């Protein structure tokens, strides 16, 4: 794991610790206890804010909103007990493969 991954893993560990905590103790515990629909709603809101920030083109806003999106994505992963390492592994698998080849390798539905 490199230095950039460390902060994501550290945040994920805190999210996992908050999973069983009282909803009164933290925003994260409260969000996790409200359930998947609330988590997904918040994730959608944050994704929209990234889009708006991207359209505005202000670097600080893009960074700020992307950090929120990363955080709420980690909350989703924590809810389902998916370690970020699984995402890193999938990205490593795709790295160096063209998007067209990667899409062609997906199972047909």
UniProtKB/Swiss-Prot annotation:
Checking HAMAP family in the record gives: HisE
In terms of CDD domains, this protein maps to:
NTP-PPase_HisIE_like
Which UniProt key words apply to this protein?
Amino-acid biosynthesis, ATP-binding, Cytoplasm, Histidine biosynthesis, Hydrolase, Nucleotide-binding
Q: Which organism is it from?
A: Geobacter metallireducens (strain ATCC 53774 / DSM 7210 / GS-15)
The record lists the membrane-crossing segments as none
InterPro entries to which the protein is assigned, alphabetical: HisE, PRib-ATP_PPHydrolase-like
One GO molecular-function entry: ATP binding
Similarity annotation: Belongs to the PRA-PH family.
> Any one cellular component term from GO for this entry?
cytoplasm
Assign the protein's first listed, main location to one coarse class: cytoplasm
Source organism, top-level taxon = Bacteria
Which protein, by its recorded name, is this? Phosphoribosyl-ATP pyrophosphatase
Q: Which residues form the signal peptide?
A: none
Please provide an example of a Pfam family that matches this protein in its UniProt record: PRA-PH
* EC number(s) recorded for this UniProt protein: 3.6.1.31
Q: Where in the cell is it found?
A: Cytoplasm
Gene3D superfamilies assigned to the protein according to its UniProt record, in alphabetical order = MazG-like (1.10.287.1080)
